[in-house]
A protein has these predicted regions:
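Cytosolic regulatory modules rich in charged/polar residues
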Residues: 1-244
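Hydrophobic, membrane-inserted alpha-helices
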Residues: 248-252
Length: 252
């Protein structure tokens, strides 16, 4: 009986059956979805594990996750946003494991969105529900194009958001340590996966702190300990500090 809902479903591809003398419309879902084949993501390949990835069709993406989680507690809630686009959004989570406060916060933010369309799919949604702040440059979520990564995150109690027309998902909450993880870590033995994560973490910290420490030592050379004397220039020659920093960045 809701004309707006009927028009929205018709524009989404459903068939509408009207019967003379009956004051309701019957919506029939007999549509097919134009979609590309399921293949491994180009930017998220693994040495071991499955070779499938998300596509641009929301119903296929939820099926790829459901294939891995056959549990009654696995929940998929469909929402819509966008005055013109009416973009479908799927919120996937596990009951009894998810943070209920975070889930309610995300659903409230999506329901209160007032946008014309999500032109850039999940990127537009991310900017709307989690706007960037200058004093917090770290991301609050991470993206993945792999259904096995999404399924593993859901089983850990995280929330996965799928947006129609997007071949990626948003996983939240997220921390700095989640960003340095890769899908291969789940397929290797625990010792190997832990070693790989620690290696990436060490390189990340060195990249972040080595340059300012170098600058501090070059401006205060009397602070350099004896076992680091080799970093000093052996000959009395002038090398601009900017070139030293550039060489250090290339070395890292």
């Amino acid at each position: 009986t809701d004309d707006k809902n009927i028009f929205t479903q018709l524009l989404s591809g459903l068939s509408c059956l009207l019967i003379d003398g009956y004051d309701r419309a019957i919506l029939i879902d007999c549509r097919t979805y134009p979609a590309r084949g399921v293949s491994e993501p180009e930017k998220d390949k693994v040495l071991r594990g499955s070779r499938d990835g998300f596509v641009e069709t929301l119903i296929f993406n939820t099926a790829l996750i459901r294939r891995r989680i056959r549990d009654v507690n696995f929940t998929v809630e469909i929402m819509q946003t966008g005055e013109s686009s009416h973009t479908d959004i799927a919120i996937c989570y596990m009951k009894r494991r998810v943070d209920e406060n975070l889930l309610k916060k995300i659903k409230d933010r999506i329901e209160n969105l007032h946008v014309d369309a999500l032109t850039m799919n999940q990127e537009s949604l991310a900017e709307c529900i989690f706007p960037h702040k200058w004093f917090n440059p770290f991301p609050k979520f991470r993206f993945s194009e792999r259904p096995d990564t999404a399924a593993a995150s859901i089983l850990e109690g995280n929330i996965v958001i799928l947006v129609d027309n997007s071949p990626a998902c948003m996983i939240l909450p997220s921390s700095v340590f989640d960003i340095i993880e890769e899908a291969d870590d789940y397929y290797f033995p625990p010792v190997t996966g832990t070693y790989l994560r620690l290696s990436r973490m060490t390189v990340s910290f060195l990249t972040l702190f080595l340059t300012p420490v170098w600058l501090l030592f070059m401006q205060n050379q009397n602070w350099i300990p004896g076992w680091l004397e080799f970093v000093k220039l052996a000959d009395d020659m002038y090398v601009p500090l900017i070139f030293q920093l550039l060489i250090l960045e290339f070395a890292i």
